[in-house]
């Protein structure tokens, strides 16, 4: 029985929880070898029994049988299309239709958001927001896709009155880092946490007495060890993570939460500045 085909064709027959399971299995079929029903249940916010019933609805005796069958189908499909289909990103191949690609990308980003939010320590997050709010000066560092996330955060913080530097040039980033002072904050964004340029900036900032906040993955890394505070992000991307799609989604969820938290701390003044900024930019049209 081709379970992948059955899952794809039975969408209208699924309940809300069953559709969650179906989407997860389709988006993560290449990684099912290391997925248990317990992990799935926790990640999707449903019961393990729901997953077992879903497997039985498709004709399998239980989740283990369904999982092994899906792994086999995926492997056979890869072998069959290996000479023609290119692995484009995560579980997406060149044989996928745009509809399938859209569903896979959407689920991948949903998972990144769900997993990242599940890790939040809100007491620590509140402390981080308070530390940032009192900083005379904020530096944001990052490379590649992380730099884009940092730039977006810098614009948001400047809009509500914070003094922020977010330079693209790594030499300038290092120069700014060594000029930080006690009370200043450096926000270092790096999923790997091992980029030498970022580590150099963090070491310089710490030496000057600045507080370092890292937005990084759960993996042990130089950045994680050096930071005073860490905000964890989760991304399902592995060997194809260079395109950093779900990574940026996870990072943006963290930076947006920081921004809204800072607005909330000083809501009246912040909203006035946002309004003034909007009025000024409207005059440029």
From Swiss-Prot:
<dbReference type="InterPro" id="IPR036388">
    <property type="entry name" value="WH-like_DNA-bd_sf"/>
</dbReference>
<dbReference type="InterPro" id="IPR009057">
    <property type="entry name" value="Homeodomain-like_sf"/>
</dbReference>
<dbReference type="InterPro" id="IPR046348">
    <property type="entry name" value="SIS_dom_sf"/>
</dbReference>
<dbReference type="GO" id="GO:1901135">
    <property type="term" value="P:carbohydrate derivative metabolic process"/>
</dbReference>
<feature type="domain" description="HTH rpiR-type">
    <location>
        <begin position="1"/>
        <end position="77"/>
    </location>
</feature>
<dbReference type="InterPro" id="IPR000281">
    <property type="entry name" value="HTH_RpiR"/>
</dbReference>
<dbReference type="InterPro" id="IPR035472">
    <property type="entry name" value="RpiR-like_SIS"/>
</dbReference>
<dbReference type="Pfam" id="PF01418">
    <property type="entry name" value="HTH_6"/>
</dbReference>
<dbReference type="GO" id="GO:0045892">
    <property type="term" value="P:negative regulation of DNA-templated transcription"/>
</dbReference>
<keyword id="KW-0678">Repressor</keyword>
<protein>
    <recommendedName>
        <fullName>HTH-type transcriptional regulator MurR</fullName>
    </recommendedName>
</protein>
<comment type="pathway">
    <text>Amino-sugar metabolism; N-acetylmuramate degradation [regulation].</text>
</comment>
<dbReference type="GO" id="GO:0043470">
    <property type="term" value="P:regulation of carbohydrate catabolic process"/>
</dbReference>
<dbReference type="GO" id="GO:0003677">
    <property type="term" value="F:DNA binding"/>
</dbReference>
<keyword id="KW-0804">Transcription</keyword>
<feature type="domain" description="SIS">
    <location>
        <begin position="128"/>
        <end position="279"/>
    </location>
</feature>
<dbReference type="InterPro" id="IPR022821">
    <property type="entry name" value="Tscrpt_reg_HTH_MurR"/>
</dbReference>
<keyword id="KW-0238">DNA-binding</keyword>
<keyword id="KW-0805">Transcription regulation</keyword>
<comment type="subunit">
    <text>Homotetramer.</text>
</comment>
<dbReference type="GO" id="GO:0097173">
    <property type="term" value="P:N-acetylmuramic acid catabolic process"/>
</dbReference>
<dbReference type="GO" id="GO:0003700">
    <property type="term" value="F:DNA-binding transcription factor activity"/>
</dbReference>
<comment type="function">
    <text>Represses the expression of the murPQ operon involved in the uptake and degradation of N-acetylmuramic acid (MurNAc). Binds to two adjacent inverted repeats within the operator region. MurNAc 6-phosphate, the substrate of MurQ, is the specific inducer that weakens binding of MurR to the operator.</text>
</comment>
<dbReference type="Pfam" id="PF01380">
    <property type="entry name" value="SIS"/>
</dbReference>
<keyword id="KW-0119">Carbohydrate metabolism</keyword>
<dbReference type="InterPro" id="IPR047640">
    <property type="entry name" value="RpiR-like"/>
</dbReference>
<dbReference type="InterPro" id="IPR001347">
    <property type="entry name" value="SIS_dom"/>
</dbReference>
<dbReference type="GO" id="GO:0097367">
    <property type="term" value="F:carbohydrate derivative binding"/>
</dbReference>
<feature type="DNA-binding region" description="H-T-H motif">
    <location>
        <begin position="37"/>
        <end position="56"/>
    </location>
</feature>
């Amino acid at each position: 029985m081709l379970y992948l085909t059955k899952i794809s064709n039975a969408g209208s027959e699924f309940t809300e929880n069953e559709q969650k399971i179906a989407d997860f299995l389709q988006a993560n079929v290449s990684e099912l070898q290391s997925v248990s029903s317990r992990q799935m249940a926790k990640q999707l916010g449903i019961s393990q029994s729901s997953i077992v019933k879903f497997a039985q609805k498709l004709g399998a005796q239980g989740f283990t049988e369904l999982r092994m069958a899906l792994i086999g189908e995926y492997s056979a499909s890869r072998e069959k299309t290996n000479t023609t289909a290119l692995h484009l990103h995560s579980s997406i191949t060149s044989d996928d239709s745009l509809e399938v690609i859209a569903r896979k990308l959407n689920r991948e980003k949903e998972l990144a958001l769900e997993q990242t939010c599940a890790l939040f320590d809100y007491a620590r997050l509140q402390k981080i927001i308070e530390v940032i709010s009192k900083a005379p000066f904020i530096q944001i560092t990052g490379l590649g896709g992380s730099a884009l996330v940092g730039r977006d955060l810098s614009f948001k913080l400047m809009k509500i009155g914070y003094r922020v530097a977010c330079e693209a040039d790594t030499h300038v980033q290092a120069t700014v880092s060594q000029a930080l002072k006690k009370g200043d904050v450096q926000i270092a964004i790096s999923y790997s946490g091992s980029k030498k340029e970022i580590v150099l900036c963090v070491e310089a900032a710490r030496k000057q007495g600045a507080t370092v906040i890292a937005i990084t993955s759960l993996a042990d890394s130089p950045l994680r060890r050096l930071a005073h505070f860490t905000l964890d992000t989760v991304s399902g991307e592995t060997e194809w993570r260079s395109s950093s799609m779900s990574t940026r989604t996870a990072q943006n969820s963290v930076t947006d939460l920081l921004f809204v938290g800072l607005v909330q701390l000083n809501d009246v003044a912040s909203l006035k500045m946002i309004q003034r900024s909007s009025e000024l930019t409207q005059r440029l049209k």
